[in-house]
Regions:
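Non-transmembrane, aqueous-exposed alpha-helical and coiled segments at domain scale
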Residues: 1-182
Length: 182
């Protein structure tokens, strides 16, 4: 609920739904509007309490099944990657570091995913090269993606740029910058 009450996150979510997800769906305009309103109302519902850790369970497979199809459809239709839904992948990558503001975060996922992230983050030094290696490693994990996402035009660069921005500028500043796109 807090996500739609925060003006920055609300703008991000609204733009993601209306500009990146809805245009990839094959429904009537009435059905699309209903879909958008229902998603936003679900987020606003004070009786539905989702905690970040519950939502984050198995995030990589959720991204693959729920978000990646829209990313690919958007790319096919617009010949460019969507900003917000690709940013979501970068945010997951940073989340799977397992730490925030110096505090440990317990991530929950299939063991192979947790092992992959642990291995890729363990020697991370914060350099642009390290960020690129990290992103390439995640995107190349075919067991999760059923293919190598590095082969998608501009995917590696865009995710790398977002991971770098999150790490160097912070999540909120990065989301604000994305909101200013378009």
């Amino acid at each position: 609920r807090e996500s739609v009450e925060d003006p920055i996150l609300n703008e991000f979510l609204t733009k993601a739904i209306y500009e990146e997800i809805i245009p990839t769906l094959s429904l009537s305009s009435e059905e699309l509007e209903t879909f958008a309103k229902e998603v936003i109302e679900r987020f606003k519902n004070p009786f539905i309490k989702h905690y970040l850790m519950s939502i984050s369970l198995n995030s990589m497979s959720k991204y693959k099944t729920r978000v990646l199809p829209s990313v690919l459809a958007y790319l096919d239709k617009n010949k460019q990657l969507p900003e917000r839904t690709v940013f979501a992948l970068a945010a997951y990558i940073v989340f799977y570091r397992g730490a925030y503001n110096g505090e440990k975060i317990e991530t929950k996922d299939n063991q192979d995913i947790l092992d992959l992230y642990a291995d890729l983050w363990k020697d991370f030094d914060g350099s642009k090269e390290a960020i690129t290696r990290l992103v390439e490693g995640i995107l190349a994990y075919e067991s999760n993606w059923d293919g190598d996402l590095n082969t998608i035009p501009n995917m590696t660069k865009q995710v790398t740029d977002y991971v770098e921005a999150i790490l160097n500028e912070g999540m909120e500043a990065t989301i604000k910058a994305i909101n200013e796109v378009k």
